[in-house]
């Protein structure tokens, strides 16, 4: 792989990441789970910030634009949901949706970590040490997000996706991510 191909693939993956987090934010907003919604709004902003930094790095260090890759819509939201209103979602549907959403998030972050680690290795193999170090920062960031997503998944499994547990953490998560977004916006 060339440096250009590596950055092109990373950029496309980040665009898809923004799409996934935006769709998960709508997914949870529709389910009236505002803590989870706020979580994915935050991660969408982070993903966009990392993508901008990636583009800026490539332009400033390689003096080129990153070529675009076709990006497939991740279709996180089931098409059947578009026929319903929020108040028509029953408890079992909500529980199953939370389970599916968390599993998608963990799978996405796992895939992302693998891609970033491979990009790091490939850049080192090409002798692009500085670029590899830039990507190493992304590996560490996604590793932290994956740890958080996996812990959330384990907690929900332990609680057997109890609707009481799910609803009980929404206010805390909403406020916590609201504060994180305020801090994020200052930088």
Predicted regions and their residues:
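Iron-associated oxidoreductase/ferritin-like identity signal
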Residues: 1-187
């Amino acid at each position: 792989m060339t440096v250009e191909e590596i950055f092109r693939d990373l950029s496309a993956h980040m665009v898809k990441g923004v799409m996934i987090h935006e769709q998960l934010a709508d997914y949870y907003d529709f389910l009236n789970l505002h803590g989870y919604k706020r979580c994915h709004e935050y991660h969408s902003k982070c993903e966009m910030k990392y993508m901008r930094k990636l583009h800026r790095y490539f332009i400033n260090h390689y003096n080129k634009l990153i070529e675009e890759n076709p990006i497939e819509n991740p279709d996180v939201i089931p098409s059947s949901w578009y026929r319903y209103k929020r108040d028509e979602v029953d408890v079992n549907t909500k529980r199953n949706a939370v389970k599916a959403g968390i599993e998608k998030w963990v799978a996405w972050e796992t895939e992302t970590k693998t891609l970033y680690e491979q990009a790091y290795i490939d850049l080192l193999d090409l002798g692009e040490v500085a670029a590899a170090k830039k990507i190493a920062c992304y590996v560490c960031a996604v590793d932290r997000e994956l740890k958080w997503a996996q812990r959330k998944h384990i907690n929900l499994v332990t609680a057997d996706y109890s609707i009481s547990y799910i609803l009980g953490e929404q206010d805390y998560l909403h406020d916590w991510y609201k504060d994180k977004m305020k801090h994020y916006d200052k930088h």
